[in-house]
């Protein structure tokens, strides 16, 4: 089931915690167009990661959080209830962002829209790549995708939405 954004909420890129509402490809692509940084520093990684930790703790979400830029891990946190398996999922989802330059959830949704799955049609090892929600590209204006912010521990759409919510807040503060 897909839905269209309510015109009265046109600035909200994704509804928060409505698992029955699956975003359309257009909505997911809009998120990527709008959630762009002017620059992305080590301090930005720390601040964004800390914001994600704060949001996850408010919800008692058992997640691991990771921020990578140009192959370097700039931030990592594992909250209570997360496991080493979440770190493996983070790596697999991040590799999808690095390879496709799009959010892991969007990549999976594009395959589903074609009537197939990422696992069936990508020809990539599912032990190495996972087109499941939770990894979002760090895109710098005039540069392109330079990294990824990733969450693992919730159902994939909730992982995706948590990252988008944090990016909306972070970038809404003029960064």
Write out the residue ranges for each language-model feature:
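Short, solvent-exposed cationic patches
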Residues: 98-101, 160-175
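Short amphipathic alpha-helical segments, especially helix-boundary/capping motifs
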Residues: 25-30, 112, 116, 139-141
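Extended hydrophobic
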Residues: 119-168
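Phosphate-binding glycine-rich loops and adjacent basic patches that engage nucleotide phosphates
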Residues: 7-18, 100, 120-131
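Structured interaction and signal-relay segments at domain junctions
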Residues: 59-124
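Intrinsically disordered, low-complexity terminal regulatory regions
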Residues: 2-83
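Secondary-structure boundary elements
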Residues: 58-59, 141-142, 169-175
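Short, positively charged
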Residues: 42-46, 111-120, 172-175
């Amino acid at each position: 089931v897909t839905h269209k954004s309510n015109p009265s909420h046109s600035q909200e890129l994704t509804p928060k915690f409505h698992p029955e509402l699956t975003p359309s490809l257009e909505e997911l692509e809009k998120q990527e167009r709008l959630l762009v940084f002017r620059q992305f520093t080590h301090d930005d990684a720390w601040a964004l990661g800390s914001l994600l930790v704060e949001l996850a703790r408010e919800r008692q979400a058992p997640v691991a959080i990771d921020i990578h830029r140009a192959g370097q891990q700039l931030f990592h946190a594992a909250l209570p209830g997360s496991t080493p398996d979440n770190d493996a999922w983070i790596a697999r989802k991040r590799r999808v962002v690095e390879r496709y330059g799009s959010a892991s959830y969007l990549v999976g949704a594009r395959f589903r829209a074609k009537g197939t799955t990422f696992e069936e049609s990508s020809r990539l090892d599912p032990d190495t790549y996972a087109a499941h929600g939770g990894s979002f590209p760090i895109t710098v204006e005039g540069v392109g995708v330079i990294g990824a912010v990733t969450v693992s521990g919730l159902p994939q759409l909730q992982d995706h939405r948590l990252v988008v919510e944090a990016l909306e807040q972070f970038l809404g503060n003029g960064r």
